[in-house]
Amino acid sequence: CVQVCDKIQSLNIWDLEGTGSRSTINVTGNRTIREADCSLCGQCITHCPVGALHERDDTEKLWRALADPNKTVVVQVAPAVRAAWGEGLGFTREEATIGKIFDALKKMGADYVFDSCFTADLTIMEEANELLVRLGKGELKDRPMFTSCCPGWIRFVKSEFPHFVNQLSTAKSPMQMFGAVMKSYFAEQIGKKPEDIFSVAIMPC
C-alpha cells in the first residue's frame, strides 16, 4: 500500500513508522485520511497485503432503504458496470445483459432503475456549454479546460496541481448530476419529497 501510493500514485499518503515488530503504517504527519491529500483512488486497498484497509460499505443502508415503505429507491447503473458485471459471475457476453441487472434490482425492491448514460450526456452538454462560454471570455488562452467527471480526479488536482484548479469544469460528475436530477425534477414528476428518495449509484470505482 505504501509503495503503490508513493511510486505509482505519487501521493505519499502513508508512512512506515517504527522498526521490527513495532512497525506500523500510518497516515503521514499523524493526520486522518480526511486531512491528508488523499485522492481516494483505492489503490492502497487493492494492494494491501494483509487486508488492513477496506472500502466503505453502504450495503446495510441500501437494505434498510429497500425495506422502508416510505422510501422510493432509485438506482443508477454506470456503463462500465453494465458492460463488465457478468465476468465475475462467469457469464458470457450474451448472458450478461443489462436487462438482467435491472430485473435483479427490481426484484430486490428498487422502485426505479436507470442507466447513467443519460446524466453523462447532461454532463457533456454542461461542459461543452461552459467551454464555449469560457473560450468566448478568453479564460482559456494558455491551457485547456479539464473535465470534472471524477471526484477522485478533482481531489488529485486540488492536492497535486492546485494551479490547475481554475481550469476545471464546474459541471457535476454524471453520478452527482443523476442525484441532483432525481431529488429535484424526478421527485416532482412522481410526486415525492426529495428526502423520501434514496438514490443509489452502482459504479465501477
Language-model regions, residue ranges each:
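Short cysteine clusters
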Residues: 1, 5, 38-44, 48, ...
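Structural motif corresponding to the C-terminal cap of alpha-helices
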Residues: 9, 48, 186-190
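Short loop/turn motifs at secondary-structure junctions
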Residues: 10, 44, 49, 109, ...
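Generic non-transmembrane alpha-helix signal with a bias for helix starts/N-cap capping motifs
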Residues: 31, 41, 98-99
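Ordered, soluble secondary-structure elements with a strong preference for glycine-centered loop motifs
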Residues: 35-39, 95-96
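Iron-sulfur-associated redox domains of electron-transfer enzymes in respiratory
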Residues: 55-204
